[in-house]
Amino acid sequence: MSDYILYNFEYIKEHQQEIIKELKTSHDIIRELGVSDSTFGYTKYNIFGVSSPSIHMYKIFETLRGIIRSQLPDGRLWIQSWLNYQDWDGVLQWHNHSSAYHGYISIEPQDTETEFEKWTIDNQAGNIYFGPGHHRHRVKNLREYKGKRITIGFDVMTDYNYQELDYYIHKNFGCIPLL
């Protein structure tokens, strides 16, 4: 895999308002279950599990799985995924991921970009970014906006992650096999 791939899934744009409504419901459920922050509580749930009755989320997961397996066709993989449901002043600052791979799906990205140390992604609805987890990145607001910035973050783990992060793995209820 090169540094990253960027895929645009038109289906998200075509059904954006319905997906936003379903993810708001999922966010409310996550909060009712005692997870106060859907981003930082990523080990406590999997957004595709919370939203499992949704046909739209099924299609997004199916496409995401295809993208990941096209890049990583062999071996055991696990995926954790969470909902970033953020206000203008709550976007993520510089960070990286301990997982082998990381990505995000732009549902309602507002006027933002994701800045990596060596490149920048213009966040557009329907974009699915996928790359190695160690690349440091942050979200930059390009202008003030009202409403929520909504993306789905995901990490893909390999056998290596399970050998290196044994303690962490047993505390992670959001990680599922990616068949």
Identify the residue ranges that each predicted region occupies:
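A short glycine-rich, His/Asp/Glu-containing loop-to-beta-strand
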Residues: S70-Y85
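Short beta-strand His + acidic residue motifs that chelate non-heme Fe in jelly-roll/DSBH
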Residues: L92-H95, R136-Y145
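Conserved metal-binding segment of the jelly-roll/cupin
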Residues: D122-R138
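Non-heme Fe(II)/2-oxoglutarate
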Residues: M1-D74, V91, P177-L178
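A short hydrophobic beta-strand segment most commonly corresponding to one strand
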Residues: H102-I105, Y145-Y162
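Short, conserved beta-strand element in jelly-roll/cupin
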Residues: Y85-Q86, N96-T112, D155
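Short, cationic low-complexity segments
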Residues: K171-L179
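A short beta-strand-loop-beta hairpin characteristic of the jelly-roll/cupin
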Residues: I107-Q124, K140
